């Protein structure tokens, strides 16, 4: 901030000792130190704010360039899509129907395959379910402990 050498600091200290006196000098030095600290923090805050505003300006410029590029891409896609639609309409209009195909064939109807997955799943043999670990009933932890506790007669 301010460039003061060691000799200048000693001269300022000697003048302050003579003018203020040895009793009040520590309190004045603390006050001056506090004020200098506040001034340095204020300058740092101002610098940070200026940097932030400069970055915002740069980001706004970048945003504008990206938006203009996106607008150009959108316009080019729009023009090519309209040209394609125009060509497609011309191709459809110019395509003449064949002489023998005056009758239109209806599109085939969708027929559900009818696989019935759940029925097939339940139709598995019981021995296969037992070996592959398919559970038909779920047990809670407490019920499992009560059922499989060793050494207790029922």
From Swiss-Prot:
HAMAP family for the chain: TatB
InterPro entries for this protein = TatA/B/E (IPR003369), TatB (IPR018448)
Describe the subunit structure: The Tat system comprises two distinct complexes: a TatABC complex, containing multiple copies of TatA, TatB and TatC subunits, and a separate TatA complex, containing only TatA subunits. Substrates initially bind to the TatABC complex, which probably triggers association of the separate TatA complex to form the active translocon.
Compartment annotation: Cell inner membrane
What keywords would UniProt list here?
Answer: Cell inner membrane, Cell membrane, Membrane, Protein transport, Translocation, Transmembrane, Transmembrane helix, Transport
Superkingdom of the source? Bacteria
Q: How does it sit in the membrane?
A: Single-pass membrane protein
- Major localisation: membrane
Q: Where are the transmembrane segments?
A: 1-21
List, in alphabetical order, the GO biological process terms annotated in this UniProt record.
protein transport by the Tat complex
Q: What name does UniProt use for this protein?
A: Sec-independent protein translocase protein TatB
Family indicated by similarity: Belongs to the TatB family.
This protein's species is Verminephrobacter eiseniae (strain EF01-2)
Gene Ontology MF terms in the entry? protein transmembrane transporter activity
* One annotated Gene Ontology cellular component of this protein: TAT protein transport complex
**Record function comment:** Part of the twin-arginine translocation (Tat) system that transports large folded proteins containing a characteristic twin-arginine motif in their signal peptide across membranes. Together with TatC, TatB is part of a receptor directly interacting with Tat signal peptides. TatB may form an oligomeric binding site that transiently accommodates folded Tat precursor proteins before their translocation.
According to its UniProt record, what is one Pfam family this protein matches? Answer: TatA_B_E
């Amino acid at each position: 901030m301010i460039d003061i050498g060691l000799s200048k600091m000693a001269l300022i200290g000697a003048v302050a000792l003579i003018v203020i006196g040895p009793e009040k000098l520590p309190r004045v030095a603390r006050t001056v130190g506090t004020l200098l600290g506040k001034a340095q923090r204020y300058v740092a805050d101002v610098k940070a704010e200026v940097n932030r505003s400069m970055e915002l300006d740069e980001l706004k410029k970048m945003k504008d360039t990206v938006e203009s590029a996106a607008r150009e891409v959108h316009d080019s896609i729009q023009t090519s899509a309209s040209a394609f639609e125009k060509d497609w309409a011309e191709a459809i209009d110019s395509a003449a129907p064949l002489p023998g195909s005056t009758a239109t064939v209806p599109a085939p109807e969708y027929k559900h395959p009818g696989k019935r997955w759940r029925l097939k799943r339940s139709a598995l043999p019981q021995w296969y379910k037992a070996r592959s670990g398919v559970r038909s009933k779920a047990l809670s932890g407490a019920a499992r402990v009560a059922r499989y506790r060793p050494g207790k007669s029922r």
